[in-house]
Curated annotation (Swiss-Prot):
Zn(2+) 4 binds at residues 137, 345. A motif (HCH Motif) lies at residues 52-54. Its main location: membrane. This is Proton-coupled zinc antiporter SLC30A8. In the endocrine pancreas, expressed in insulin-producing beta cells. Expressed at relatively high levels in subcutaneous fat tissue from lean persons; much lower levels in visceral fat, whether from lean or obese individuals, and in subcutaneous fat tissue from obese individuals. Expressed in peripheral blood mononuclear cells, including T-cells and B-cells, with great variation among individuals ranging from negative to strongly positive. Belongs to the cation diffusion facilitator (CDF) transporter (TC 2.A.4) family. SLC30A subfamily. The gene is SLC30A8.
Length: 369
């Protein structure tokens, strides 16, 4: 099929491929299977109008695996969190320790955030609609941001309770029970952080960015681990020096500072993503130089790089080619080069001739540093 505009889009969606044009508003939609997209038949790539890079595996399978992997992590974390939350509530009540109870309260918030992340993860798997053409992918980001907000609210409540204990120190703490419960909490949170930790290398040793929901959950678990360690330290202090029971509310203050600090980085990354910023894993100049290095490319403008989620990068660009080179061949080479060097969710390349370039056009200017 021929298109009026030489525009190209690669889109990895679950079980479907989409090809769009600028002027014909025509949509090709067909399932991806082994007969249509074999890996060992490169001649079809030359004859067909679409180059679809699978990077060694089908994008549909990759997306399904990522979804199942994230779901498994969040479900496992929820189960662990629920069990030890109940244990800490009972143990904290018996010990009379605010630090243990606050740790249990934070586990409750973690459990809520894990369930919220599971819901947003399910929502992000829903297919696109005519109104939401990119689908519900960013529901995952909104869920993660809401989870961070919950952390801040609970942290504020715990700081308030700690202040009350500093002002009214008429309370008793059973240090032995506190040590036992806090030791179990440390072990539980170590298991949680191991389960939720997801740094790995993708194809061609490219680092795959973390799923946003799992990343937010990991921050929760990391904050819990710091809290549990500080509770254990304060329990040991109170056990050997009962007159230093002020360590209990001080532990809560330390925990609050650590947790708030741990949310700043992830909040910054999510803010850049929502502002359509270039992903941290990519360099704008590096991507442009890679395109310019392709034989036949004269210039690149209107280059835009952004993300749907932490691991779904989208790129679009206008490329001017030499008249002596077949623009469709150049387009395929650009797509191959980009897909080989970076993990791309979507790639749109509009091929143009040098006469189409306008040096005075504001939209064609390179962005400022």
């Amino acid at each position: 099929m021929e298109f009026l505009e030489r525009t190209y889009l690669v889109n990895d969606k679950a079980a479907k491929m989409y090809a769009f044009t600028l002027e014909s508003v025509e949509l090709q939609q067909k399932p991806v299977n082994k007969d249509q997209c074999p890996r060992e038949r490169p001649e079809e790539l030359e004859s067909g109008g679409m180059y679809h890079c699978h990077s060694g595996s089908k994008p549909t399978e990759k997306g399904a695996n990522e979804y199942a992997y994230a779901k498994w992590k969040l479900c496992s974390a929820s189960a662990i969190c629920f069990i030890f939350m109940i244990a800490e509530v009972v143990g904290g009540h018996i010990a009379g320790s605010l630090a243990v109870v606050t740790d249990a309260a934070h586990l409750l918030i973690d459990l809520t955030s894990f369930l919220l992340s599971l819901f947003s993860l399910w929502l992000s798997s829903k297919p696109p609609s005519k109104r939401l053409t990119f689908g519900w992918h960013r529901a995952e980001i909104l869920g993660a941001l809401l989870s961070i907000l919950c952390i801040w609210v609970v942290t504020g409540v715990l700081v308030y309770l700690a202040c009350e204990r500093l002002l009214y120190p008429d309370y008793q703490i059973q240090a032995t029970v506190m040590i036992i419960v806090s030791s179990c909490a440390v072990a539980a949170n170590i298991v949680l952080t191991v389960v939720l930790h997801q740094r790995c290398l993708g194809h061609n040793h490219k680092e795959v960015q973390a799923n946003a929901s799992v990343r937010a959950a990991f921050v929760h678990a990391l904050g819990d681990l710091f809290q549990s360690i500080s509770v254990l330290i304060s329990a040991l202090i109170i056990y050997f020096k009962p007159e230093y029971k002020i360590a209990d509310p001080i532990c809560t203050f330390i925990f609050s500072i650590l947790v708030l600090a741990s949310t700043i980085t992830i909040l910054k990354d999510f803010s850049i993503l929502l502002m359509e910023g270039v992903p941290k894993s990519l360099n704008y100049s590096g991507v442009k130089e890679l395109i310019l290095a392709v034989d036949g490319v004269l210039s690149v403008h209107s280059l835009h790089i952004w993300s749907l989620t932490m691991n779904q990068v989208i790129l679009s660009a206008h490329v001017a080619t030499a008249a002596s080179r077949d623009s469709q061949v150049v387009r395929r080479e650009i797509a191959k080069a980009l897909s080989k060097s970076f993990t791309m969710h979507s790639l749109t390349i509009q091929m143009e001739s040098p006469v189409d370039q306008d040096p005075d056009c504001l939209f064609c200017e390179d962005p400022c540093d």
